[in-house]
Amino acid sequence: KADDVADVATDIAKHGDDFVQSLPSSKKLRRNLELAGVEVPDYPNAAHHIVAGSAPGAENAREILTKFGIDINDSSNGVFLPTQRNVVNSAYHPSLHSTEYYEKVDDMLSAATNREEAIEILHEIADQLAEGTFFN
């Protein structure tokens, strides 16, 4: 596991005090979620980036992550979601790639004034997605 953590650390480039995002990777996000102790569901699932790694509608939210030094593949930016409908109450992963989703994530994350608050908001979003209540 120490090697896995070291691999994650080397994926994040730092130049002085400027934080540079690594490239989004669902495989790396999955590994980071598992390393953080997040239980992998027993149904078909995807490691979902709460703040999308490349979608144009998520640019501002990505800037917020960068501002607070949170990598796009950090476990705090992830949640396991079903890839099949109606297996659990969680949000269906493919349905989340929408303008409405990106705007709501951005609105919520914009309230963060520091790294801890940003992580807390990401955890809140993850919980809502896992419970299927994000759009309620």
Region locations from a protein language model:
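Membrane-active amphipathic alpha-helices enriched in small hydrophobic residues
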Residues: 1-5
